[in-house]
Amino acid sequence: LLLTVCSVFVVYAGREWMFTNPFKPYTFSSVSYASGDGDGCTYVIDDSNRKILKISADGRLLWRACASDKSFLSAERVVADGDGNVYLHDVRIEQGVQIAREGIVKLSSKGKYISTVASVEAEKGSVRRNIVGMVPTEHGVIYMQKEDDSILVSNTEQGSSKAFSVADAQDRILCCAYDRDSDSLFYVTYDGKIYKYTDSGQDELLYDSDTVDGSIPQEISYSDGVLYSADIGLRDIIRIPCDMENTGSTDRLTVEESLKEREIA
């Protein structure tokens, strides 16, 4: 079973988080993003967004890819498909914070550049990302892209795209998750709410940070009927079952619980 969920426990801890394997020590420090694959390997982006590491399940460094190799510019997300190919959300930044272009870059299982599978030009002066999520498939990647009033979900494996109508998506949405089996879209808004898309035009509110003091939900991922979000305010993981019986029954996990249970590792 292909693991399709990003390791959001790393994302929320960001620059302060470190991990050491007790048998073959390897330390991650200043991490900005990480994800796992079906073999138990971890892909890590450092806080400069210019270096990516692949670490084996037993803590060995398998390879390192750097922006200086001309494979990418500034990596903000990373996932691996079922074939072992690696996909990066790559961003070109100009004048400090302004985004000139975004893309999806494909690397081989050895970390070598293969191609750019998607490219999105940014509006002049924009500081917000248009690509707001990635989900690996068996032979490719699904990525979510904001448009004015919709989220475009594109599947590189199938060469297909589908638009989900979401009012003011460009200004409201921070990030997305997608479940291919149920064709379900989830998203986090800048004001700290998590929604599930519905065809009715009234999307279902799954979580509202206004009801939890200090909560700031960020990156989300979906796996086996459960939605996870890194809470950078409370420094834990929001866990939201999304099956028919338990939708809305939110609970929370510590980073240690998440690692132990392998739910989002």
Outline where the language-model segments fall:
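Flexible "stalk/tail and boundary" regions
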Residues: 5-265
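N-terminal Sec-pathway targeting helices
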Residues: 1-3
